[in-house]
């Protein structure tokens, strides 16, 4: 982080000007982020695709931090979120010669959704939360995190819960519906109600749809991304699937 601090003193940010047009894929656990990312595999020669670094969280020199966090959040929430911050920052600043980078989640959702939820439910003591906030402030001031468009895979907690049950990841076996409901509200506050700072536009997709019917939503977002790149402009502020418009209006 010394290089980042040096850049900050010079009035520039570390990694500034090094990243292409960057799209962040956001949504609850079980919202279909990895499936969405797989949709762009056909463009892998032109796009830098970065999945959420879950495998790193599962193996920190032989330690499964993700599993430990779910089993004993009071003890492991702080080290887990510290490592999440590091690994997400590595993805944000990873060099690429591609014209487009698409990332599964970001340092923003870690801060505004997961860390905030841990503070609210008591998994993070106030001192722990304050420490993480200081890290986020340092990153915000010193390191450039490219974000041109957020794709929000908007999913009801009940649908997300059923998908989690079906995929049966061992670490997620203890995830209750209430936890997904809490995360859903935090995503809504951030991406729909805009109660958190936003540096880019948001495209909202109806991710409750099953695989047979969600292709239209994928195609809509794909067109929006490539149109924005070709015109060097960002899409309209909040583009919402027709089936979701009434919910956003409330």
Swiss-Prot record:
The keyword Transferase applies. Keywords: ATP-binding, DNA synthesis, Kinase, Nucleotide-binding, Phosphoprotein, Transferase. This is Deoxynucleoside kinase. Monomer. The modification Phosphoserine is found at residues 236, 241, 243. One of its GO terms (cellular component) is cytoplasm. It catalyses: a 2'-deoxyribonucleoside + ATP = a 2'-deoxyribonucleoside 5'-phosphate + ADP + H(+). Its EC number is 2.7.1.145. Coiled coil: none annotated. Subject to feedback inhibition by dTTP. Signal peptide: none annotated. It comes from Drosophila melanogaster (Fruit fly). GO terms for molecular function: ATP binding; cytidine kinase activity; deoxyadenosine kinase activity; deoxycytidine kinase activity; deoxyguanosine kinase activity; deoxynucleoside kinase activity; kinase activity; thymidine kinase activity. It is an enzyme of class 2 (transferase).
